[in-house]
A protein has these predicted regions:
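Short helix-adjacent coil turns
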Residues: 45-48, 102-107
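A charged, solvent-exposed segment within the mature domains of Sec-exported extracytoplasmic proteins
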Residues: 112-135
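Short, solvent-exposed, charged loop/turn and helix-capping segments
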Residues: 64-82, 99-101, 105
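Bacterial Sec-dependent N-terminal signal peptides
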Residues: 1-24
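Acidic/histidine-rich, surface-exposed loop or edge segments in extracytoplasmic proteins
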Residues: 35-44, 68-72, 96-98
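Immediate post-signal-peptide N-terminus of mature secreted/exported proteins
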Residues: 21-58, 129-132
Length: 135
């Protein structure tokens, strides 16, 4: 019985997070497109595969610049979010520069991609917080 409760809780939370992400990306399509590129590059890197980020670092940086260059949708427009979006752009551009220079080790590329991924998850976390700070 306890395992059934755990499984149902896991499924409910997974569904809730999926619905929340779809709502966020529906309100902020550029962020959704950024996520599409990030997910296809980050998850392979967890197994040591840097080929996807090497192929798509420019696209990742471009979407980060688009996200940062557009107004943040009203429900999410807070000081912490604005600051984190700028950090996302900075880390994504840094990732692209590392790849384009061609001198970074595989470990350094994976570490930078992981850092970029962590900043993205900070954006997701901030999107779930109460939105009281609009200036």
């Amino acid at each position: 019985m306890n395992n059934i409760f755990r499984i149902l809780t896991f499924l409910f939370l997974g569904f809730f997070n999926l619905v929340n992400a779809q709502s966020l990306f529906g309100n902020w399509p550029e962020l959704g497109l950024y996520h599409d590129v990030l997910s296809t590059t980050f998850h392979p890197s967890e197994n040591g595969d840097t080929a996807p980020i090497k192929a798509k670092s420019g696209e990742l940086a471009s979407w980060a610049q688009k996200v940062a260059g557009k107004p943040i949708p009203t429900p999410y427009d807070t000081r912490p979010m604005r600051k984190t979006i700028q950090k996302l752009k900075k880390e994504s551009v840094k990732m692209d520069r590392m790849v384009r220079k061609g001198r970074a080790s595989e470990a350094a590329i994976i570490a930078q991609l992981s850092k970029t991924h962590d900043v993205f998850h900070e954006v997701i976390r901030l999107s779930k917080e109460p939105h009281e700070d609009h200036h």
